[in-house]
Amino acid sequence: YAYRLNMKKKFEDFIKKYLPGWAILPLLTIVVLNCLIYWGSDQLTSARYHYDFTGTLDRMVPLVPAFIWIYILAFPFWAVNYILAAQRGKDQFYRFVATDLTIHLTCFVIFLILPTTNVRPEITGNSWSEQMLQFVYAMDGGNSPSNLFPSIHCYVSWLSWRSVHKSEKIPEWYQHFSLIFAILIIISTQV
């Protein structure tokens, strides 16, 4: 029982230190709005023509299934960095949230006006990476993906880096890591 109480206390201390109460509702709003925009725009445009944005570069770049792990790790990376954004103080955090919500709503309008798709490369192997890639493809529209332009993965990754960049409260090594990981996430959307 004492162990559970100690763990609960550590968790509460962690939350107090990294996630101020005033940041919880804005962060939940971002999560809910992201889901509504992503799946809502998909539903609203499902019967409409989707413009194929598969370009020459897309056809030239080979599929690298191992990058699916970077793509998946984007989700906890975003969560951590969005929480760390609160370390910059209330005013800067609210500006960060306003930027995120503005970009999300802009994406929503673009998704509705210009529904897009692309041709996904065929997955021929059966490695763990290829199986995970097939799973993600199935979760994300199968052979008919949508909401591809602009890329929410790319902008959220960039914004995640910006949330910690030049922050006195975030270690410099983590700021550099965030930049590198954000770039890897952006690459993962291409390969």
What are these language model-derived features?
Residues 6-78, 129:
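N-terminal transmembrane-helix/juxtamembrane module of multi-pass inner/ER membrane proteins
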Residues 14-17, 58-65, 88-91, 140, ...:
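Juxtamembrane loop-transmembrane helix junctions in multi-pass integral membrane proteins
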Residues 35-36, 104-112, 180-191:
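Aromatic-anchored segments of alpha-helical transmembrane domains
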Residues 46, 114-118:
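Short helix-capping/hinge motifs at transmembrane helix termini and TM-loop junctions
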Residues 68-81, 105, 153-156:
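Hydrophobic alpha-helical transmembrane segments
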Residues 80-113:
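Interfacial segments of alpha-helical transmembrane regions
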Residues 118-142:
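Membrane-interface interhelical connector segments
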Residues 135-191:
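Membrane-embedded catalytic cores of phosphoryl/pyrophosphoryl-handling enzymes
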